[in-house]
């Protein structure tokens, strides 16, 4: 109607509204999906469902697959060509079957696949952005809980189950109930040496692992705006760790600079048109959220988890907490169990905790910026005796980039293992695992019991803290060296 001012909307509301195919009272909205990412673990049954129903993949052009979760990252022969199609290195029969099945399914249904040995193979949430597939204003799904990573670009991205994977393969749509919205207002600036990983761990410790449940979150504030795209992806990646369905950051010149010139990004006049549209996406002045959270970035110091969920964390300056000092009995009980599993004594300074393994990698912190940060700390130093350090790039392209910069030499000369791309020690689904009782400092996203191997004990940290820990053999920040 002429003269009517549109209702102010949030970023998430704009993206949602532009993708509604069908909406009816009392029913979920039917959303069009712009990009569907696949890997070997959650897709086999979905393809079986298509096969049984005699259906095809509706939009193969919007469907991309890669091999990442089960893939080994250590090879005797360092040549990429030796890895092309080579399943002999996958010794676990279940893992090998899943990889073989993904290859057959992609060949049968015409889905683009980046397998082991491919120059674009890697962790699904690393290759999407680096290939320019992830773009502002998109809807993106994957059968993986850390799909929220792509929200760093202003996309509505979330993980789905295997039955939903089949639905998207068959229809390129997905029924979804409209979620509530939440703003995370990050005030102040991060101090030098404090990273995006520290910020998001501090946030989860503040709000708890259920603080975002049922919400699509938007991260806002000057501290967020000052982050690189790699830092923003770290923040968005861990949205699920505090219960949020998705986590978005409004696109800006930093976003556009990252995307410009990437293989699948718009070019020429299409680029100008895309940027003009993307600039309309940020939340309107006057738009309201269902709830808001405030975090003071200036008060954050290097952070580490002490327990068995990402919310059980504290400043590296702190000591192991006393469970009896928590506010509620469920929190006290969870802390008691965590300390028992982690074999920690109340009051022990966190800096006194020794580690057996250090892992740098994952879809949280396996990008080139993360590897540079770790290398800056390790340069000219050695990994402590008795400590094993694995550095695993998030993609083959990240690995190639790092080697072009000489980072691989920094790592290997320090005594770390320089590996091939994959999910690696983030989860115990491939050969890179902890042994029972081993303690690790890890740049991944989850520290659940047994997450990195049965009986393994995980402390989540940033790449600089991981590198400093490798040098000292105990939890440490670079300033401690």
From Swiss-Prot:
Entry EC no(s): 4.2.1.33
Protein family: Belongs to the aconitase/IPM isomerase family. LeuC type 1 subfamily.
Cofactor: [4Fe-4S] cluster
Organism: Salinispora tropica (strain ATCC BAA-916 / DSM 44818 / JCM 13857 / NBRC 105044 / CNB-440)
Subunit structure: Heterodimer of LeuC and LeuD.
Pfam family, one: Aconitase
Stated name of the protein: 3-isopropylmalate dehydratase large subunit
UniProt GO BP: L-leucine biosynthetic process
Keywords associated with the record: 4Fe-4S, Amino-acid biosynthesis, Branched-chain amino acid biosynthesis, Iron, Iron-sulfur, Leucine biosynthesis, Lyase, Metal-binding
Gene: leuC
Cofactor comment: Binds 1 [4Fe-4S] cluster per subunit.
């Amino acid at each position: 109607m002429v003269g009517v001012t549109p209702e102010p909307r949030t970023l998430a509301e704009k993206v949602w509204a532009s993708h509604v195919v069908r909406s009816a009272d009392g029913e979920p909205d039917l959303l069009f999906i712009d990009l569907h990412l696949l890997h070997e673990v959650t897709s086999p049954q979905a393809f079986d469902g298509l096969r049984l129903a005699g259906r095809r993949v509706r939009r193969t052009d919007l469907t991309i697959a890669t091999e990442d979760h089960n893939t080994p990252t250590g090879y005797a022969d360092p040549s990429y060509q030796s890895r092309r199609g080579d399943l002999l290195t996958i010794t676990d029969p279940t893992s090998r079957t899943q990889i073989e099945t993904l290859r057959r399914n992609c060949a049968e249904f015409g889905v683009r696949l980046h397998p082991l040995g491919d120059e674009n193979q890697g962790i699904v949430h690393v290759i999407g952005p680096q290939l320019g597939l992830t773009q502002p204003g998109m809807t993106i799904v994957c059968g993986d809980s850390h799909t929220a990573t792509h929200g760093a670009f202003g996309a509505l991205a979330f993980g789905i189950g295997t039955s939903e994977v089949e639905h998207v393969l068959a229809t390129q749509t997905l029924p979804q109930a409209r979620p509530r919205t939440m703003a995370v207002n990050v005030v102040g600036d991060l101090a030098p040496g404090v990273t995006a990983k520290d910020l998001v761990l501090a946030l989860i410790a503040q709000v708890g692992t259920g603080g975002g449940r049922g919400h699509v979150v938007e991260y806002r504030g000057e501290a967020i705006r000052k982050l690189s795209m790699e830092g923003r992806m770290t923040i968005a990646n861990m949205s699920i760790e505090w219960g949020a369905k998705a986590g978005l950051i409004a696109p800006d010149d930093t976003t556009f600079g990252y995307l410009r010139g990437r293989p699948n990004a718009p070019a020429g006049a299409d680029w100008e048109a895309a940027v003009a549209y993307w600039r309309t996406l940020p939340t309107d002045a006057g738009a309201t959220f269902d709830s808001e959270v405030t975090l003071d970035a200036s008060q954050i110091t290097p952070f580490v988890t002490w327990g068995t969920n990402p919310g059980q964390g504290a400043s590296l300056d702190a000591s192991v907490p006393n469970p009896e000092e928590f506010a509620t009995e469920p929190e006290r009980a969870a802390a008691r169990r965590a300390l028992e599993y982690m074999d920690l004594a109340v009051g022990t300074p966190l800096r006194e905790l020794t580690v057996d393994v250090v892992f740098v990698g994952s879809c949280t912190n396996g990008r080139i910026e993360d590897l540079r940060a770790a290398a800056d700390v390790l340069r000219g130093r050695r990994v402590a005796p008795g400590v094993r350090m694995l550095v695993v790039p998030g993609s083959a392209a990240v690995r190639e980039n790092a080697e072009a910069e000489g980072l691989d030499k920094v790592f290997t000369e320090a005594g770390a293992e320089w590996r091939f791309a994959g999910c690696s020690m983030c989860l115990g689904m491939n050969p890179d695992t902890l042994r029972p009782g081993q303690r690790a400092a890890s740049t991944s996203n989850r520290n659940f019991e047994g997450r990195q191997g049965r009986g393994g004990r995980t402390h989540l940290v940033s790449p600089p803290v991981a590198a400093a820990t490798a040098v000292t053999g105990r939890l440490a920040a670079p300033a401690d060296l």
